Amino acid sequence: MVAESLPYGWQERSPKQVAAIVLLILMAMVLSFVELPVVPGAEWLKYDPSGIVSLLATILYGSWIGVAVAVTSWIPHLVTDPLGAFMNIMATVSLILVVGTVYRRKPCLMHAVLGCAAGVVVSSAVSICLNFVVTPLYMGATYEQVASLVLPALLPFNVVKALANSVVAIVSYRKL
């Protein structure tokens, strides 16, 4: 009766798994507040390591749990920086869904690496496309100004962010 009321992905979880997932959510939430500027001259582009935890949750428990970790960890930021939080959630979720889909086909290190490689490309593409909508709202920039930021700032930032999260998650996965 209680299991029927649980959201998708939680029904068959043991209490130990649920506790581990909650700890992953809390860890990601704390790490989401560690924000480091990466691109000189574009201080609003900040890296945070919470995506690492979301990727590990995806590899360990599946895509929907990874999405839950990513979204839940950024809820506090929706109040202070709704556009930045939205962008971070979308970038992380696009990475997670690709990694989870590839890894689920054959759960092994090679598929985790392949999923991360494809996820970096997809996440970067999604982020660049969304930047053409969100950056004008965030900074009052024109389409041309956003386009001029793609190569020197937006593309490197998004690739570095997704790649860093992927590399650390894969190294951590190997230790598990």
Predicted regions mapped to residue ranges:
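Loop-helix junctions at membrane interfaces
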Residues: 1-176
